[in-house]
Every structure is written in C-alpha cells, then in structure tokens.
C-alpha cells in the first residue's frame, strides 16, 4: 500500500534542510584548502565538505521520514545506521542494485546488478550533498544541494538549493515548481515557467562527464550539429542546476550522459512540474533508472533526441 504523505509540508521542510546544508557548505568554503580534496576517480573529486553536508542532510531526513531509505552519492547513511543503497537502483520496489561491480568508462556503476538484490523500502531519499564539487573547489558558481523523494519509480519531491545565489528551487508532484529567495523584505517565492524558444534561438547546456572518453562521439555530434545553429551553448558544471535553469526558462535545453541518479532526480521533477519535458537518451520518459537525461522546454525535445540517437 502506498504511503500518504503531506507533500507540501514535507517539501518545505526539505527546503529548510537544504538551506542548512548550504549554510554549512558556504561557511566551510571560507576556510577550505585544496589539501582536503580526494579523488574518487580520474577528475572526479570529493571533499570532507561533501561528506559533512551529506551527514547533516541524512540525519535531518531520517527524523522527517524514519521509514525511508537512502540513495546518496557519498554513502554516509549506512555508516550512521540507516540503509544506504548507494549507486544505481531498481525503483519498482522489488530491489536495489549495488555499486560494487564493474565500472563503465565514466566511473558510474553499470546497470547490471553485481550482487543479489536486497529489498528496497517504498520510500527513498536521493541525495547529492554538493552537486558541482569541482565548481566548489575552484570557487566557480553554481554548486548546489539536491534532494529528491521517490515512491517506487515516482518522484514526489524535488528540492535544489543553489548556494552562491541563495536560491531554492522546489516542487512537489502535481502542484508546480517554484523558486524562493531571501530578500530584505523576507522570503519571496515565485512560480517557475519554461521558455518558449525554438531550436534556432535556444540556449543549450551540454555537460561533459568528468571522464568523457565514452561520451566523445555523442558530445561531438551534439556540438557539430548545434554550434552555429542555436542561440548559444554553455556548460555549467552542475546537473541539478542545469535542470533548474531549464525549469526557470534561463536555459532552453540540457543534455548529459553518464550521471548518477542523485545528479538529476530532484531537478527532473522541477522541470516536469513547469511543463517541460524530461527523457533519457532513448526518448523514454521512464528515466529514473538510467544514467542519461535530456530536459527541455518541450518544444526542442525532439531536436536534441534526434541528434543523440544518431550519435
């Protein structure tokens, strides 16, 4: 039986949690040194700040929904006594796939489970405690906290807090998506809307994974096709923020492959709740188990899909 949750109350509480984590990250950045950076894989970094932020978030989310499990990027939830299904997961309630098996060229877990699957809880938090770690290290905006709540394959809540601009993007299923900001007169909130740009005037974000060898044919085809034929192309270094920028109409489309569920899950709901379109690279709207995302205003979705399918 599906569990009934007060999604509005839960979402606003998650916004507060994300802001607290963001305040921690902002404070630690003022005293951060490169000596504290670790390499997970080639060009893929993690710091004590990622792990500290994740512990803060997991602790608060456990209090909010004690029955929920976790998919987290840094794998701290299991250390603190809560099952952490780090890595690629089945989201149909039947089980969770481990991350201890073979890696693809970009370091992400393959979709084939290396071990027998274990039962998954009906509710899962998907957490990226610091999306855009390389940006953070270099003091280059944006970087963000990303938190999503799943029930089966359905994304119920998405919250992304951009630390440098102090903007919290959020959505809960069926209501729309919003952004809140702290201003002199207090906290303000406004509804988000995707753009209405067509492909010839579109501003696209084409992200490169940290190890892009396997992605070179696709990104080359994307750039060769669209460079000079769209408004412009950008890279921003944060999947969560690229999705939020699409939702806010600041970008018209975004495409990336070889990314984790924590990178895109929250932002994808935010895009969809504004009327945008999100699929994987095959064009499937059942993108929650994959490692590729295309998100657009809906108008240019087929333009991007046609190119990635032919790469």
Which residues does each PLM region occupy?
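An extended, acidic
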Residues: 192-311
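Generic C-terminal helix-cap and adjacent flexible tail
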Residues: 2-5, 183, 306-311
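N-terminal subdomain of lithium-sensitive/metallo-dependent phosphomonoesterases centered on the IMPase/IPPase/PAP
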Residues: 1-127, 299
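Short helix-loop capping/hinge motifs at secondary-structure junctions, enriched
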Residues: 176-179, 184-185, 213, 300-303
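DPxDG-like acidic metal-binding loop motif
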Residues: 121-184
